[in-house]
């Protein structure tokens, strides 16, 4: 029973490891396996997760969000502020970290002001903000980080590729915030304590992690410096890293590497990608989620602009299209009981609506 509970709580890494194991039956382990793993991507992801965990422990992100929300006095403006801070947070952190940080804050604000009836839509819009708003920077989500390193995309070109879908996504998200009524509310005055000295030190470490991603310093140097600093300053941050995400990533490297060596699979994806990498990437993401879709499809195409856009807008749609969406679902069901069906219906309506608009618009834009 305990094993089943553990597997249920860690479903994604378990599924990823099982998928890798199945492909290993068709491609037995050999020396080529060593070439599957992008050590730089794994190192950068680890450093970002560790530093962000340290910053969250120091109380910085909840404090910034609370002060932003306190400047607004209606349900619509408060929810918009929460959604915007999630969007901005996803660009600086990772999408899952932004949700882990700001979804609890939203519940605190909505419950404290008697506006829990807006929890479902607020959480869904924050989910869209995290998954779609974070597409603008290379280090905001795992698929961007991987593709940025895999194709060695120049910084300026990355921004040029992702700016149009980012602007459209932001406009759609802000438009949906208008669905929240302008009811007057009083935001709770309680403020999260913050350790200013630690925030400054961790801010320097975050800049170091960003420099690693942007190729400003060698990744091994940043990895050594950040790990050593946190071992001294905050070992809990290292323990708090989402190790399941790192295991998932490593397993999907194995999965995609093996799939790329199975000839019928190679033939199938080459035929599919001949019809356009972007729609194939977006639709593949609906089934296996956008991180493994990015890793898998990168083995079969050099059209990285279309693949990059496809896996990012493919984060909208099904609940599994982005792993971060499972965080939103888990957080909602933890706080709100008996409304799961309503939440899933609203989630599907909003998320598939976003996917349809973005896919149509970007297909036209990238012709």
Question: Where are the model-predicted features located?
Answer:
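Membrane-interfacial loop-to-helix junctions in multi-pass transporters
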Residues: 39-41, 70-83, 112-123, 197-200, ...
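Flexible interhelical linker loops that connect adjacent transmembrane helices
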Residues: 2, 66, 179-203, 235-239
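Transmembrane helical segments that form the transport core of multi-pass membrane transport proteins
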Residues: 36, 58, 62-67, 205-302
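C-terminal transmembrane helix pair
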Residues: 159-170, 279-367
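Hydrophobic transmembrane alpha-helices that form the pore/transport pathway of multi-pass ion
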Residues: 82-84, 88-132, 295-309, 337-341, ...
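Interfacial loop-to-helix junctions that mark the boundaries of transmembrane helices
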Residues: 3-9, 31-41, 153-165, 191-196, ...
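Membrane-core helix-loop-helix motifs of multi-pass transport proteins
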Residues: 114-182, 188-191, 328-358
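Structural signal for alpha-helical transmembrane segments and their membrane-water exit/capping regions
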Residues: 2-32, 44-59, 179-182, 208-236, ...
């Amino acid at each position: 029973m305990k094993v089943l509970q553990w597997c249920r709580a860690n479903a994604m890494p378990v599924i990823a490891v099982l998928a890798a194991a199945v492909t290993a039956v068709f491609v037995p382990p050999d020396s080529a396996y060593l070439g599957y793993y992008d050590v730089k991507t794994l190192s950068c992801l680890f450093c970002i997760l560790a530093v962000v965990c340290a910053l969250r422990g120091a109380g910085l992100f909840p404090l910034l969000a609370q002060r932003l929300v306190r400047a607004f006095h209606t349900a619509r403006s408060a929810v918009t502020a929460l959604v915007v801070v999630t969007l901005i947070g996803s660009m600086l952190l990772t999408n899952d970290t932004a949700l882990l940080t700001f979804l609890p804050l939203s519940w605190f604000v909505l419950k404290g002001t008697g506006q829990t009836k807006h929890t479902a839509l607020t959480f869904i819009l924050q989910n869209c903000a995290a998954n779609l708003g974070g597409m603008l920077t290379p280090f905001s989500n795992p698929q961007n980080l991987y593709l940025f390193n895999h194709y060695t995309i120049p910084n300026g070109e990355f921004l040029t590729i992702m700016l149009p879908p980012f602007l459209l996504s932001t406009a759609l998200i802000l438009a949906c915030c208008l669905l929240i009524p302008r009811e007057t509310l009083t935001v709770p005055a309680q403020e999260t304590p913050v350790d200013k000295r630690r925030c400054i030190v961790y801010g320097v470490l975050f800049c170091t992690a960003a420099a690693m991603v942007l190729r400003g310093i060698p990744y091994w140097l940043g990895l050594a410096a950040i790990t050593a600093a946190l071992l001294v300053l905050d070992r809990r941050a290292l323990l708090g890293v989402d190790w399941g995400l790192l295991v998932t990533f490593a397993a999907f490297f194995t999965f995609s590497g093996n799939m790329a060596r199975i000839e019928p699979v190679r033939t199938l994806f080459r035929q599919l990608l001949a019809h356009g990498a972007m729609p194939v990437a977006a639709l593949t993401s609906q089934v296996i989620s956008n991180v493994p879709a990015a890793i898998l499809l990168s083995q079969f195409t050099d059209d990285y602009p279309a693949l990059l856009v496809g896996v990012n807008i493919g984060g909208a749609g099904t609940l599994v299209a982005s792993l971060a969406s499972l965080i939103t679902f888990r957080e909602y069901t933890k706080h709100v009981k008996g409304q799961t069906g309503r939440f899933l219906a609203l989630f599907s309506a909003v998320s598939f609506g976003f996917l349809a608009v973005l896919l149509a618009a970007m297909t036209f834009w990238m012709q």
